[in-house]
């Protein structure tokens, strides 16, 4: 065969076997930007159904990490696959730019004490640098999107829109000022949202403390059997926050629970009866039950405040008291606990902060004023011990909320803040996003009622709370995976009123003026907010910092402007209104978004914030579906941590293996669970990639001289195996489309790999090689095979392009012969072959027969009956119905099984017999053919090869055909 090698159709392709991705990929990133591929995609999709993906913006601080890469690549896969499916897929990337981390960084670099405008300017410059840095890294991953119009929450227009959007929520009566316990970080010097908390193990000082009975006679009368009070009596509470003891305002009991009075060596102690034995066992003291009373019978009893000797506190009914731990009696400090505060508010019991914003005890507290928390706790415990009310002190390890930025334990302390109420009723219905200004009637509390022509024209919607509206809004929203719904529902049910105010400088301001005496809002707040927004839109938030109330006609003697800024979760949670529904943007997509896609921690974060803002303003969710992905862990299942040294840099993967390897790992990992990554795992991904790349290379080689405009064979002239290959290609496309549509990217990678390795590499391409290599170059048999391969290659590239974006584009450039063309400009509908169920049914029998043939050939080879399969002749015995199905394909079976011949015989069961063929072998194609005869030169050639050589000789004598691209 070697002397005939040059006469075979062995084509070359510029698509190399080795990907060399780290070197090739950056050039494609530059090309996509220079050729405005995303903009051309949008132009090509004009008039198609829209598919809008909103971007949960990453924070503009530091390099991107592997979690960022997972999130953004998943979004990119969604975007590209929706375009391929025939949608006008839209994604505007963006960044979250305000907040404490950047402000803290500026303080580190420039010190504290700078004027607000200077802080804001430096923060803005720093945030911009960070976004540009992250932009480069994101683009390196192959992300397509509207990058020229990427948003930053610090954009002047976006900041102004946020003020207008907040006013819409306030105008519905959902924004209020209140004194409530909030999560407080002493390092941030600010309140924190629930989403800004991380739970970590903490060892606290836990104490059992007694609250002494003030009136023994009253106390004794509350028990069914009046006890003898020959010792001091006290109700015992248990707390892991002894620093709140000076703030104790009451003791809570469960109304229907039994409480026992127990005689112990030092005192008479009251605790819940079901918890008594465990408690006294832990104390190691003898005890005897003296009397019983229900919790409701103890309500109203006066007790001595444990820290302040002359102060009394009452026993109250508390519905949240449980009997699974502690003493069944709860220490209530309304300034330091949400449930405590709400209960005491209803009962008219006041509370006061005992710790300031810096984490020190209030200066006016005796003995502990001004002390740091740890020192003060030691003094409190010592005082209780000296007073005889310390029952027990012990270390207690538990999960405790920490600041997600500083990793330090937070405090619960009552501060005046602004809240969005979860349980305030308001009328539902989508608000007009363009109507920010309303007239109002404002009461002393500052809560406003909307009055206006637009409202009068609208039919009033149902009245619901924000919590109920949020529950209803997600009722029909699909979640991927479905289990994520429970997390969202739990977030809604357990979410307290949203504290949206922060005590920082770098943030969008609360744009309100309040009275100096009663803190009520200015009656013209709506108009004033619009005036402020106009200035912010021109000059940014610095306009608020330098604004004097008098400039807007506000009496500075009566009113002052707020100094609080908005929670950054409000910034990002409102982008559906401030960015995606901004009338100033030429094309912002539809509303609500078709998909929100973020990590599993975002149910409390961006998902929750977006849901609450959407329902607060419009009574609906800003998304139609939610996809949640898991966190990245190492190969041993451990969380990524710098201290463990197991972090994986997406930049390093892109620079050493290629971004397509990272993308393939992301797509081939079940994102619904934790996503494991390691060098070993990536190496397996590389092997999968190589097999797929080799398939692409084979396909490109064998259509290199094919131009469908001149060379395509009509469907009626295709061999039946080619029609079958196209039918299987359509099945592959349909399966990929379905998997992409349900966001099952793992299924797509399995389909693509299986299609390359089994359907193509393991069947069709093997069957084609002889026809491709040895047939007449422009003969109908070879062109028929190339017609099928051309369609297969186009559809395979479109199907893998959302995942293997760089490789698919590299291959498409060769395939199309035009660098201006892009695989991302094409859809399945343009290229997918029509369904052909009849071909599938015919060839199902061949595929079922193939394992029997393979086994028989292996046995014959093992018995040294044959060497190559082409030396074999097969006798296929099968039932009549199988033979009837195979009969029309009889002429193609030898080529499909790569044997010299196939004979069909009737039998009860399928069986395959192998014999060595007596036919001579063609020296050019190596097929054993009856037509093989000696050439004049003495060479043994089959009729087909003689014809091919003759055609080749005539072609060489004539003018050579001009080279054409493969399309």
UniProtKB/Swiss-Prot annotation:
Alphabetical list of InterPro entries matching this protein: aa-tRNA-synth_I_CS, aa-tRNA-synth_Ia, Anticodon_Ile_BEm, Ile-tRNA-ligase, Ile-tRNA-ligase_type1, Ile-tRNA_ligase, M/V/L/I-tRNA-synth_anticd-bd, Rossmann-like_a/b/a_fold
Residues the record lists as binding ATP: 642
Cytoplasm as UniProt keyword: yes
Domain of life of the source: Bacteria
Transmembrane stretches, start-end: none
Short name of any one Pfam family annotated for the protein: Anticodon_1
Co-factor(s): Zn(2+)
UniProt-annotated binding residues for Zn(2+): 922, 925, 942, 945
Its biological purpose: Catalyzes the attachment of isoleucine to tRNA(Ile). As IleRS can inadvertently accommodate and process structurally similar amino acids such as valine, to avoid such errors it has two additional distinct tRNA(Ile)-dependent editing activities. One activity is designated as 'pretransfer' editing and involves the hydrolysis of activated Val-AMP. The other activity is designated 'posttransfer' editing and involves deacylation of mischarged Val-tRNA(Ile).
Entry's family note: Belongs to the class-I aminoacyl-tRNA synthetase family. IleS type 1 subfamily.
Cross-referenced HAMAP family: Ile_tRNA_synth_type1
Protein name: Isoleucine--tRNA ligase 2
Biological source species: Burkholderia pseudomallei (strain K96243)
């Amino acid at each position: 065969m070697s002397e005939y090698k040059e006469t075979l159709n062995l084509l070359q392709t510029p698509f190399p076997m080795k990907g060399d991705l780290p070197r090739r990929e950056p050039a494609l990133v530059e090309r996509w930007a220079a050729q405005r591929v995303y903009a051309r995609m949008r132009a090509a999709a004009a008039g198609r159904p829209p598919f809008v993906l909103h971007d949960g913006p990453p924070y503009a601080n530091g390099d991107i990490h592997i979690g960022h890469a997972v999130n953004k690549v998943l979004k990119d896969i969604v975007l590209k696959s929706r375009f391929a499916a025939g949608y006008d897929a839209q994604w505007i990337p963006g960044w979250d730019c305000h907040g404490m981390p950047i402000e803290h960084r500026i303080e580190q670099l420039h010190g504290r004490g700078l004027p607000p405008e200077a802080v804001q300017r430096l923060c803005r410059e720093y945030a911009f640098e960070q976004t540009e840095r992250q932009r480069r890294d994101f683009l390196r991953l192959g992300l397509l999107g509207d990058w020229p119009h990427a948003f930053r929450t610090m954009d002047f227009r976006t900041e102004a829109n946020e003020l207008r959007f907040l006013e819409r929520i306030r105008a519905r009566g959902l924004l209020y000022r209140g004194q409530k316990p909030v999560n407080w970080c002493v390092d941030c010097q600010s309140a924190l949202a629930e989403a800004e908390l991380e739970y970590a193990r903490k060892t606290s000082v836990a104490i059992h403390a007694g609250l002494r009975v003030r009136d023994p006679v009253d106390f004794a009368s509350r028990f069914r059997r009046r006890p003898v009070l020959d010792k001091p009596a006290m109700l015992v509470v248990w707390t892991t926050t002894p620093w709140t003891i000076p703030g104790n305002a009451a003791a809570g009991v469960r109304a229907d629970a039994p409480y026992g009075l127990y005689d112990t060596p030092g005192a008479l102690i009251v605790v819940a009866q079901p918890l008594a034995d465990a408690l006294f066992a832990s104390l190691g003291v003898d005890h005897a039950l003296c009397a019983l009373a229900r919790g409701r019978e103890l309500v109203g009893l006066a007790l001595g405040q444990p820290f302040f000797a002359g102060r009394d506190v009452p026993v109250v009914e508390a519905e949240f008291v449980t009997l699974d731990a502690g003493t069944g009696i709860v220490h209530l400090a309304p300034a330091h606990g949400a449930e405590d505060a709400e209960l005491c508010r209803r009962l008219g019991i006041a509370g006061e902060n005992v710790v300031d914003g810096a984490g020190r005890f209030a200066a006016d507290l005796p003995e502990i004023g001004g002390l740091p928390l740890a020192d003060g706790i030691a003094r409190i415990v010592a005082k209780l011990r000296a007073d005889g009310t310390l029952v027990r002190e012990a270390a207690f390890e538990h999960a405790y909320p920490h600041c997600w930025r500083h990793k330090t334990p937070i405090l619960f302390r009552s501060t005046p803040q602004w809240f969005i109420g979860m349980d305030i009723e308001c009328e539902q219905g989508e608000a007009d996003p363009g109507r920010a200004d309303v007239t109002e009637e404002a009461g002393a509390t500052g809560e406003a009622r909307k009055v206006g022509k637009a409202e009068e024209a609208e039919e009033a919607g149902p009245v619901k709370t924000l919590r109920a509206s949020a529950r209803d809004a997600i009722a029909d929203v699909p979640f991927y995976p479905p289990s994520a719904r429970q997390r969202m529902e739990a977030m809604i049910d357990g979410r307290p009123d949203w504290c949206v105010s922060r005590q920082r400088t770098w943030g969008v301001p609360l744009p309100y003026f309040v009275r100096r005496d009663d803190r009520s809002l200015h009656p013209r707040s709506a108009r004033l907010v619009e005036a402020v927004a106009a200035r912010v839109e021109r000059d940014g938030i610095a306009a608020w910092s330098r604004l004097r109330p008098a400039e807007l006609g506000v009496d500075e003697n009566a009113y002052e402007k707020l100094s609080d800024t908005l929670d950054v979760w409000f910034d990002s949670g409102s982008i559906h209104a401030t960015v995606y529904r901004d009338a100033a943007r030429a094309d912002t997509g539809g509303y609500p978004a078709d998909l929100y896609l973020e990590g599993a921690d975002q149910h409390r974060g961006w998902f929750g914030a977006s849901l609450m803002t959407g329902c607060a303003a419009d009574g609906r969710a800003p998304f139609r579906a939610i996809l949640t992905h898991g966190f990245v862990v190492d190969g041993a299942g451990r969380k990524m941590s710098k201290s463990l040294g197991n972090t994986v840099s997406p930049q390093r993967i892109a620079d050493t293996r290629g971004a397509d390897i990272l993308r393939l790992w992301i797509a081939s990992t079940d994102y619904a669970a934790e996503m494991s990554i390691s060098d070993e795992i990536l190496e397996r991904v590389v092997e999968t990639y190589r097999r797929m790349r080799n398939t692409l290379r084979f396909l490109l080689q064998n259509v290199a001289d094919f131009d469908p405009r001149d060379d395509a064979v009509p469907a009626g002239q295709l061999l039946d195996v080619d029609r079958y290959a196209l039918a299987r290609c359509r099945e592959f496309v349909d399966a990929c489309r379905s998997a992409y549509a349900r966001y099952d990217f793992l299924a797509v990678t399995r389909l693509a790999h299986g299609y390359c390795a089994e359907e193509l590499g393991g069947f069709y391409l093997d069957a084609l090689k002889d026809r491709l290599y040895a047939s007449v170059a422009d003969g109908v048999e070879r062109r028929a095979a190339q017609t099928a391969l051309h369609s297969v290659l186009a559809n395979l590239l479109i199907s893998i392009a959302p995942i293997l974006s760089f490789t698919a584009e590299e291959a498409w450039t060769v395939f199309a012969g035009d660098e201006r063309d892009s695989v991302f400009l094409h859809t399945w509908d343009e290229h997918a072959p029509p369904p052909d169920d009849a071909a599938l049914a015919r060839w199902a029998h061949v595929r079922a027969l193939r394992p029997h043939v393979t086994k028989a050939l292996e046995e014959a080879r093992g018995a040294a009956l044959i060497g190559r399969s082409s030396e074999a002749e097969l006798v296929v015995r099968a039932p009549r119905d199988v033979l009837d199905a195979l009969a029309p394909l009889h002429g193609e079976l030898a080529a499909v099984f790569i044997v010299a011949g196939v004979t069909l015989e009737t039998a009860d069961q399928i069986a395959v017999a192998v014999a060595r063929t007596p036919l001579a072998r063609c020296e050019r194609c190596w097929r054993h053919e009856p037509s093989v005869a000696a050439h004049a030169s003495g060479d043994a050639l089959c009729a087909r090869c003689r014809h091919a050589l003759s055609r080749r000789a005539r072609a060489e004598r004539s003018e050579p055909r001009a080279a054409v691209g493969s399309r």
